[in-house]
Amino acid sequence: MKKLGKQTIKFDTPPTILETACIAGPKEADGPLAKYFDQCLDDEMWGEKSREKAESKIVKQTVNALISKSGIPSNKVEYCFAGDLLNQCISSSFGLRELNVPFYGIFGACSTFVEGMQLASVFIERWNKLCYM
C-alpha cells in the first residue's frame, strides 16, 4: 500500500466485495431498486416498539444473511466495521453483539458507508501483510 499525495492510497491488492446483503424498509421497497434487496419489510419498525430495537434487528438479520450468502462461517469473521445514525451506534452494537467479534463503530452520518469501506480496506491490507508475509 502506497500513499500518493496527501489523501490518495494505492492498494497492493485492491479491495474486493465478495458478497452483499440488504434489508429495506417499505419506502425503499416501493422504489426501482426493490428487486435487488434480499428482504423488503412491510413495517419499518419490524414489530418492535422502538427504532433502536427495529434497527438492531435489521442489522442482525442483514449480517446473518450476508454470512449465509457468502458461505463463510460466522466464526471466521474476525472484525466488523459498521455505523448507524442512532444513539452512538447503539443499533449496530446490539445488532452485532451475538456475532462476538471486535466491532469498530463509525460515527460519520452520511459518510458512514464510504468511511467504513475505506477503513476496512486499509485494515485488511495491513492485516494481510502482518499475518501472511
Q: Model segments located where?
A:
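Active-site-proximal alpha-helical scaffold in enzymes
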Residues: 106-132
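Conserved "HGTGT" condensation-loop signature of ketosynthase/thiolase-family condensing enzymes
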Residues: 1-104
